[in-house]
Every structure is written in C-alpha cells, then in structure tokens.
C-alpha cells in the first residue's frame, strides 16, 4: 500500500479490516482512505468510507471487500542509500550510510520466486527460494532494518534491541518510513532468537557480549543462514577472528574486509576530508 495509489483486497473475517488498519496506523499510514463494501449485490449492501486510523475497532460482515486509497504513494527503492540525516537518531549508535550499503550487498538477499518443487525425499512440495526472514541483531536506530524492509517487501525483518532508548527510536523510524514488514522485539538477542522463525539472513551490528551464543542459536535454526557482522572496537575484532574457526566447523565460506570511509566537510570557506572510524565486516555463508 505504501507504493500504490489503490489496493483492492478480499476479506475473510469480521475483524480483518480492523487488524489491517491497526497495522497501517502503527507504521504511520493511518491517513490512508479505506472503502469497505459489505454484502455487495444483496439488499442490505453497505458501503463504508473512513480513514484507516478510524477503523481500528470496527467490525464488518464476513462477506466484504476493501479498497485502500493512498493519495501519496512512494516510489519503491531499488537500492539502499537513505541519507543518515533522514533517520531519527538521538544518542544511539547507527550503522552509517556507506557501511549499510556494503552490509546489505553482502547479505545478498533474494526474494521468493514463487517456484514450487516436489521433494522426493520428503514427499512434500517446497518453495525453491522462500521469502526472506531477516534478523537485525542490535538494531540500534533501525537504519539497517529500515533499508532492508523497504528493499525486501516479500520478507520480514526482525529488529532485535535491548536498550529502551533504541527501541523507542526503532518505533519512531518505522513510523516515519511507513515500514509494514518490520517487527520490533525488545530484549536480549539470546533470549529473543529462540522465539523467532528460522532466519535466512542475519545482520549482527551489536551482540551485548553474547556473540558466540547468538551464533550457535542461529546455526541451530538454520545452518545455511547467511550472516554479516560489523565491528568497530578492537575487542569485537578479536572475537571475529574466532569466527573463522566457527565457519570452518559449519563448512561455510568466511570473508573479512576492513572499510574506511572519509567524508568531506566544510571548514569555513574551505572543504576538508574527515576520516570515519574503520569498520570490519565479516561475511559467513
């Protein structure tokens, strides 16, 4: 609905309109107009038109359809690159724009092709390339989660964060960018991950000192998950060297690069280059 002027949908329950409208309101799309048609072509046919934010508690007949009208649809992003200043930041650390672009590229996320194959061993029909399930561990302001959500409409991004101030920023940024496929989970990653579906892709920007436990949990859920990690401190970089052994144990590829970004800034009438902190980026899988 974010990217289209009109979206029509069939409804299967009396509370379905309310649930959709609640979700739209949560992500800052409460001003979308909703037209609900109940029992169309019957003598008691009824048409209701209201804003989504005003339909969060209403119930409708099970025989209903709805049209969602967005007067200000946004063009769909084809590549990452939201400017840092666009995010609501506070004092919470944020993965910067250039690093985000490399991280997202290294995650290598692909959307569901819709192709279904029959697996002879299990006797079941299986999706050849399922919709992505992405963890953002230590999500901070949500800059990576937001970019991933906007680029991966078929998937779900789980933003995991333990700091209350950061969780507030996650909600604020999700509403600002109108992201509907991003779930925010407050708590320690090692306690949250067991409750989630198996991931296809994981970004770890912060681990709270539980990196190896988190890695074990991820591989227990999906040994083929693709994982990207970043580190700025020497202590975290030292931990990353151990990840090479973990990758070998799980028989997955391991790659480590260092990224150093230098940005221009104004100094009176002049322009100078200012170096940012170097960042280590590890890719596994």
Name each model-derived stretch.
Residues 5-8, 198-206, 213, 226:
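Short SAM/SAH-binding signature in class I
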Residues 6-91:
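A contiguous loop/helix-start segment that scaffolds small-molecule binding in enzyme catalytic cores
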Residues 112-120, 131-140:
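Conserved class I S-adenosyl-L-methionine
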Residues 125-126, 141-153:
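Conserved SAM-binding loop of SAM-dependent methyltransferases across substrates and taxa
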Residues 130, 150-156, 221-223:
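Conserved S-adenosyl-L-methionine
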Residues 160-199:
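S-adenosyl-L-methionine
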Residues 161-166, 206-207, 232:
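Short beta->alpha hinge that forms the Motif I/post-I loop of the SAM-binding pocket
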Residues 215-278:
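C-terminal substrate-binding/active-site "lid" region of AdoMet-derived donor-dependent transferases
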């Amino acid at each position: 609905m974010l990217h289209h002027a009109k979206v029509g949908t069939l409804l299967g329950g009396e509370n379905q309109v309310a649930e959709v409208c609640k979700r739209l309101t949560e992500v800052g799309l409460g001003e979308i107009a909703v037209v609900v048609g109940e029992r169309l072509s019957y003598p008691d046919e009824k048409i209701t038109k209201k804003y989504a934010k005003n339909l969060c508690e209403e119930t409708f007949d099970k025989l209903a359809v709805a049209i969602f009208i967005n007067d200000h649809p946004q063009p769909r992003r084809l590549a990452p690159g939201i400017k840092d200043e666009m995010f609501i930041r506070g004092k919470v650390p944020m993965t910067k724009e250039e690093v985000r672009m490399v991280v997202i590229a290294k995650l290598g996320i692909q959307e569901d092709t819709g192709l279904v194959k029959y697996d002879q061993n299990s006797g079941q029909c299986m999706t050849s390339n399922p919709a992505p399930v992405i963890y953002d561990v230590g999500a901070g302001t949500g800059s990576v989660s937001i970019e991933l959500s906007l680029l991966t409409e078929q998937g779900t991004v789980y933003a995991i964060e333990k700091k209350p101030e950061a969780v507030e920023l996650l909600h604020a940024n999700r509403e600002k960018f109108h992201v509907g496929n991003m779930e925010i989970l407050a708590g320690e990653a090692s306690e949250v991950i067991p409750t989630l579906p198996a991931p296809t892709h994981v970004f770890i920007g912060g681990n709270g000192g539980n990196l190896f436990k988190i890695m074990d949990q991820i591989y227990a859920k999906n040994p083929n998950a693709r994982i990207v990690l970043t580190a700025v401190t020497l202590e975290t970089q030292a931990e990353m060297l151990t990840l090479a052994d973990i990758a070998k144990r799980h028989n997955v590829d391991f790659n480590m690069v260092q990224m150093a970004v230098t940005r221009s800034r104004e100094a009176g009438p002049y322009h100078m280059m200012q170096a940012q902190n170097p960042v280590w980026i590890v890719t596994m899988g």
